[in-house]
Each structure stands twice: as structure tokens, then as C-alpha cells.
């Protein structure tokens, strides 16, 4: 149930209402000033099993009354103080002057430069200013959209009218995690509380998914494993799979989700949170994979099966995407257990499994392999069988250009480089292979994918490619930032046909600039 109330406060003049029509109307005449006070609420409560709290009427009514007593100036001062306490914690600048032109015009000038279309282009100072504005806009969206006691941010908003994009869901195969990539390094740790709290409820529903998909059950009082597939909702949908789309199979979702949560601990060093909330979840998912991993005689390693590399190629055993996140999850859980001084017997089991995952494999083109059977780009060979084209390789529905599929927007086989940390400059063989794979994927993409590529290239230390993606994102139009600064997924041919707002591109850009300037692994 949703309730909204609007109060109109006039200074001078007169006010009247008309309820005779289909839509009630409020009219103000000859006023010196008008203040609109709006409040809304729902009876949603983030609590299993029915997610139903109290009727919102009393709370919304009280909020309107309290705001009315404060008045406009006090309300504004409260808002500025609340926002500034978070936003003003850090500054980023390159001695650029703030341009005195509207942002949409500045974006258009920058786009002219990127597209080389002959239009007016920005000065160097204007370029730096806009790049910083886009960075700080990601922090602004974090502050505005993710606060304690609320739901975490998602793709486009949770509560929408009609059949809006992605149904207002949470995508756990990169998107919701990307939303929180910049939060901690941008000194906004409090803004991740909503995400952490959501995971604490999601895991309870996720035990049903683990039982249904893998037969690993948690009876009353047991915590034997929890999963979330590609999609979730405010009502903790966690099932794996999607009709006619392999992308729904994402058993690694919970391990990836907890990577953000573990980084929250690393930044805050909140040992109470680690001990009482996070470690039980880490341990539960580690125990799940300790049981669910399958020893493949053919591959001579433990593998996740069945396995899928979002959103590219066929269903396989041991896709690099799964293997890398399982390795990282074991690593984080082992570190957490050793920090707390607990579960030494389990740590030994986890280390044994982790040592036999072999999560990064190098192919014949020098690339990080996306699948075990991959040989060259787009080719695969299993055992003594002949080499074949990889089924559904580069399948990007709606992105064809002249009948040719562009490089795929997902880079699921490079998670060990970012957001994980198995690939680093300390391992040049793997780093070189990651660079080969990055070059194959190219610099162009849709908005959120550019953001991921920005973080990946930043991790390699290749400033030229990283900055090219900064420019491609800021000046990317329908496959980058729109003139209102919101990031676009981009629909139609080559992701440039028409805009689809998708907020993770904003957050990923901010995270990428963080990585370009300062890295903590």
C-alpha cells in the first residue's frame, strides 16, 4: 500500500480546492510565495515472510505536520546540513575553473569533441570540470539513493508505474554490485548500510534457492548455504533460472554480493559487524561451495556445474566467472575466519578446495579463457574432438551493427582483475593475458560496460586506454552520459539507438576514477 500527501502553504493571496472533477485541483491566487510539502510512504517492511508493516497513513501525516511546523528555510537548512556532512568529505579537482554554462550545453560540447562532428568543443579546463562533475554526480546519487533504513539502489528504481525496464529488479550478475563499487573509496561508508541490511534478509530466502537448485537444504536453525540468481526484488526473489535465457542461472550471485560487504569491513574495520553479521554469511556460502563443487576428472580441478558466463556463450562446467568468484570468496572467508580466530578446521577444508580451482587459464591467443574448452577467440575444443565455433559467442541481442556482432559488453572472465584481486601486477603472466582479453573486447560498449572497462583498464595501469573510456563515457550520449548526467544503457543498433537510463554506469564511472587515482587491494 502506498500513500502520498501534499500540503500547499501560501504566503499572501488565497487558496482554494476543487474536488468536483476526476482529478482534484488546488488553486493559489495572488500569493507572494508558495511552499509545496510532499511526503509519501508504503506499508512495505523488509522482513520475511509477508514484507508487510504498518499502514503508512499515520507516519505520512505526522511527517507533513512536522515539516509544516519547520517551514521552508529550516527544511532547506536541514537538508543542506545532512547532504553536506557526507558530500563535503572529499574533493576532486585539477585546478579547473567551473564553467558558467548549463551542464547540458557542456555535455553537448564534450560530445562534439568525442564524436568529432564539427560542433563547438570544450576548452581543456571545461573538459576537466565536466569529468569531475560526472565523478561527483556518482557520489551525489549514492547519497540521495542509498541511506540507512531504505532499500539499496538498483538499475532504474524499485517502485515504478506500469511495465518499466527490468521490472524494477536487482541484477546480481554485475549491476547492483557496481552500484556500490565507489561507495567506500569515496568516503561514504554509511551509504552502504542499506545494501548490507538487504543481504541479511536476502540470505534467508536464498536458502530456498540453494535447496531447489543444488539440493543443499537448511532445515530449521541450519545455515547450509544461500544463493541468489541473476534477479532479485524487494521481496527477496532468489530463484535461479529464467525462461529462454541462460542469464538467469547465476549461482555465484551471493558470493559476489558478499564481496562488497567484505570490503565494507576492510574499510571500516567494524569487527562487531564482521563477527555478528558478515562472517556467518561468508561462512555459509563458503560451506555451500565446499559441498557443491564437483571434481572434474576431465579438467582436473574442482568446478562449478552447471556454469554460465554472463551473458555470453553456452552453459558449461567451470566457467571462469564462477571459478574466480569462488576462489575470491574462499580467500575472503579464510581471512575473516583467521581475523576472528575461529573455524580452523573449516579453513583447512576451504584452502584445500581453493587450491584446486585453477580460476585463471590462458588460451592460445594469449587471452584469459572464458571457458575451459576455449582455444582461440571464438573457438573451442573438447578432448579429442575437432575445434568448433563457440555456441552463442558474442550474442548481444539488439546490438548488431551491419549484421556483425560487436565485442560483447560483459567481461565476466576478467572478474579476477576487477572487482576481485587475483590478477595483479605481481602476476605478469595473468596481467598480460587480461590485457589481451581487454583489447579483444574493445573500448566501446554500453554505459555500464564502459564503466567496468574503465575499472579494468585502471587496474592494468594503462592510463591511455582508461582515459579514452572516460571520454567515451562522458561524451557517449545514448551509450554513456545523457545531457542530464544520468548514464544510459543504450538500446538499438550498437547500443546507440535510443537511451535507457541505468544508474550503475554512473556509479561505475566514479569507481573507475577512484581506481585511476588510487588503488587499494
Descriptions of predicted regions:
Residues 172-175, 184-208, 221, 246-267, ...:
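Active-site core of glycosidic bond-cleaving carbohydrate-active enzymes
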Residues 1-170, 189-211, 341, 400:
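Acidic/polar, glycine-enriched structural segments that form the non-catalytic walls/loops
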Residues 46-49, 53-57, 154-169, 222-275, ...:
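The feature captures the catalytic groove of carbohydrate-active enzymes
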Residues 95-113, 149-157, 220-239, 254-261, ...:
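Active-site-adjacent bridging/hinge elements
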Residues 37, 133-134, 141-143, 180-182, ...:
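Structural recognition of the beta-strand scaffold that forms the well-ordered cores
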Residues 20, 122, 161-166, 173-180, ...:
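Flexible glycine/proline-enriched surface loops and loop-helix/loop-strand junctions
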Residues 140-151, 165-172, 191, 204-210, ...:
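Secretory-pathway/luminal and periplasmic proteins that interact with or process carbohydrate-rich
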Residues 131-145, 254-263, 279-289:
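Extended, hydrophobic/aromatic-rich amphipathic alpha-helical segments that build helical scaffolds
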Amino acid at each position: 500500500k502506498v500513500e502520498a500527501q501534499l500540503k500547499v502553504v501560501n504566503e499572501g493571496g488565497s487558496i482554494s480546492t476543487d474536488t468536483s472533477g476526476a482529478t482534484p485541483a488546488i488553486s493559489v491566487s495572488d500569493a507572494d510565495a508558495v511552499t509545496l510539502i510532499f511526503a509519501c510512504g508504503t506499508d512495505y517492511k523488509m522482513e520475511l515472510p509477508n514484507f508487510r508493516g504498518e499502514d503508512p497513513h499515520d507516519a505520512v501525516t505526522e511527517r507533513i505536520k512536522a515539516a509544516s511546523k519547520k517551514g521552508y528555510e529550516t527544511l532547506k537548512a536541514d537538508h543542506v546540513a545532512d547532504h553536506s556532512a557526507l558530500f563535503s568529505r572529499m574533493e576532486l579537482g585539477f585546478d579547473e575553473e567551473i564553467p558558467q554554462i548549463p551542464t547540458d550545453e557542456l555535455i553537448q560540447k564534450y560530445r562534439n569533441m568525442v564524436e568529432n562532428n564539427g560542433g563547438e568543443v570544450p576548452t581543456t579546463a571545461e573538459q576537466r570540470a565536466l569529468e569531475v562533475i560526472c565523478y561527483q554526480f556518482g557520489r551525489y546519487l549514492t547519497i540521495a539513493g542509498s541511506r540507512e533504513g531504505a532499500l539499496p539502489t538498483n538499475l532504474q528504481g524499485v517502485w515504478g508505474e506500469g511495465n518499466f525496464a527490468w521490472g524494477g529488479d536487482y541484477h546480481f550478475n554485475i549491476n547492483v554490485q557496481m552500484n556500490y563499487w565507489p561507495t567506500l573509496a569515496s568516503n561514504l561508508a554509511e551509504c552502504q548500510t542499506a545494501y548490507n541490511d538487504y543481504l541479511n534478509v536476502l540470505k534467508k530466502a536464498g536458502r530456498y534457492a540453494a535447496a531447489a537448485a543444488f539440493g543443499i537444504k537448511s532445515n530449521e536453525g541450519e545455515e547450509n548455504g544461500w544463493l541468489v540468481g541473476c534477479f532479485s526484488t524487494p521481496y527477496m526473489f532468489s530463484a535461479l533460472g529464467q525462461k529462454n535465457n541462460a542469464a538467469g542461472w547465476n549461482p555465484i550471485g551471493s558470493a559476489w554480493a558478499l564481496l562488497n560487504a567484505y570490503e565494507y569491513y576492510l574499510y571500516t574495520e567494524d569487527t562487531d559487524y564482521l563477527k555478528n553479521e558478515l562472517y556467518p554469511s561468508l561462512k555459509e556460502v563458503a560451506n555451500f561451495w565446499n559441498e557443491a563443487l564437483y571434481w572434474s576428472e576431465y579438467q582436473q580441478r574442482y568446478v562449478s556445474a552447471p556454469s554460465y558466463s554472463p551473458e555470453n556463450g553456452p552453459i558449461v562446467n567451470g566457467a571462469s566467472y564462477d571459478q574466480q568468484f569462488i576462489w575470491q570468496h574462499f580467500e575472503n572467508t579464510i581471512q575473516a575466519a583467521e581475523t576472528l580466530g575461529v573455524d580452523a578446521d573449516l579453513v583447512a577444508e576451504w584452502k584445500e578446495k581453493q587450491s584446486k580451482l585453477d580460476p585463471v587459464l590462458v588460451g592460445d591467443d594469449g587471452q584469459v579463457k572464458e571457458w575451459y574448452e576455449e582455444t582461440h577467440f571464438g573457438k573451442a575444443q573438447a578432448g579429442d574432438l575437432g575445434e568448433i565455433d563457440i555456441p552463442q559467442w558474442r550474442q548481444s541481442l539488439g546490438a548488431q551493427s551491419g549484421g556483425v556482432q560487436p565485442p560483447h559488453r560483459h567481461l565476466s572472465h576478467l572478474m579476477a582483475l576487477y572487482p576481485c584481486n587475483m590478477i595483479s601486477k605481481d602476476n605478469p603472466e595473468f596481467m598480460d593475458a587480461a590485457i589481451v582479453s581487454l583489447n579483444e573486447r574493445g573500448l566501446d560498449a554500453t554505459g555500464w560496460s564502459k564503466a567496468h572497462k574503465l575499472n579494468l583498464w585502471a587496474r592494468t595501469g594503462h592510463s591511455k586506454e582508461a582515459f579514452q573510456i572516460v571520454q567515451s563515457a562522458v561524451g557517449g550520449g545514448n551509450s554513456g552520459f545523457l545531457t542530464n548526467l544520468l548514464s544510459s544503457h543504450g538500446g538499438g543498433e550498437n547500443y546507440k539507438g535510443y537511451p535507457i537510463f541505468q544508474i550503475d554506469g554512473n556509479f561505475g564511472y566514479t569507481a573507475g576514477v577512484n581506481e585511476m587515482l588510487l588503488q587499494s587491494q
